[in-house]
């Protein structure tokens, strides 16, 4: 089976993705994961999967241990917290076994650019990653990428499914089509069907569902990080059991995905999230995206 994974941005909430992905790997061989994409802080998750650094990523989340948004803002802007985390996590000696894509936002036009990395770590990547994880309200000035101002990719594509579906023939390690895409996001009312028409089975999940959709965007307290990882791990085990307990046809996989979607639909519609606010900017970014020239290979 050929699988693609999509990790949305979500600041501290991306800790949910750690637990869910660890559970998923109990049922899926990592070699079957052919592509990953991540936006904003979701890039950390995608990179951790591709480079086998989930333990290091969990340590980074727990070492922050800040619950107050203003204190977090001070530590990022004044003390360089995010810069230090990136410098220690994205490092020489890393090797990516899964092609990874992430978006940046060209500013002030708000158009989208996607960058692909794979293989041995190249220090050249860091400036692109810094631009892609560059919250305007937290990190200060935009970065300059290819002679253009660039900011956090979550502004234009916080759930980067597009490059996984559209560019797989060029960037994936397999020439076969994907058999399944799993999207891990934090917007309960998200529905990829409104934007994409595809025959590939797609499971989109709000990974905070098993924790009553609890979303404290700026809470990096150690106890809360532990809670997010633990509840999403349980959720991941439950869904993986439903998806992969039987090795059968793609049609049956689609049927089980639809069953999961319908079983969660009503509960998801009763909840909202600040992540929904990004959909306004994401709509603009996608409208301004140049499909013929929005991807760049960095490996």
Model-found features: residue ranges?
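Gly/Ala-rich beta-loop-alpha elbow adjacent to hydrolase catalytic centers
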Residues: 38, 42
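Patatin-like phospholipase
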Residues: 1-37, 47-299
């Amino acid at each position: 089976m050929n699988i693609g994974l999509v990790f949305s941005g979500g600041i501290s909430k991306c800790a949910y993705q750690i637990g869910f992905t660890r559970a998923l790997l109990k049922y899926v061989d990592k070699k079957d994961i052919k592509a990953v994409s991540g936006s904003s802080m979701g890039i950390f998750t995608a990179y951790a999967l591709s480079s086998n650094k989930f333990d290091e990523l969990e340590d980074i989340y727990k070492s922050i241990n800040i619950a107050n948004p203003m204190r977090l803002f001070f530590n990022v802007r004044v003390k360089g917290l995010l810069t230090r985390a990136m410098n220690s996590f994205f490092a020489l000696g890393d090797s990516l076994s899964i092609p990874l894509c992430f978006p940046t936002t060209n500013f002030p036009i708000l158009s989208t650019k996607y960058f692909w990395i794979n293989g041995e770590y190249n220090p050249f990547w860091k400036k692109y990653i810094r631009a892609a994880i560059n919250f305007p309200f937290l990190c200060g000035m935009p970065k300059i990428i290819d002679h253009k101002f660039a900011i956090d990719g979550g502004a234009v594509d916080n759930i980067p499914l597009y490059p996984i579906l559209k560019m797989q023939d060029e960037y994936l390690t397999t020439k076969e089509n994907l058999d399944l895409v799993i999207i891990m996001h934090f917007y309960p009312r998200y529905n990829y069907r409104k934007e994409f028409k595809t025959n590939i089975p797609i499971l989109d999940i709000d990974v905070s569902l098993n924790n009553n959709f609890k979303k404290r965007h700026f809470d990096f307290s150690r106890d809360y990080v532990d809670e997010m990882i633990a509840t999403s791990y349980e959720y991941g085990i439950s869904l993986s059991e439903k998806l992969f307990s039987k090795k059968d046809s793609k049609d049956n996989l689609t049927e089980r995905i639809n069953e999961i979607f319908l079983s969660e639909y009503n509960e998801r519609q009763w909840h909202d999230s600040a992540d929904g606010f990004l959909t306004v900017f994401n709509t603009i970014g996608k409208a301004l995206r140049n499909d013929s020239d929005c991807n760049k290979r960095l490996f």
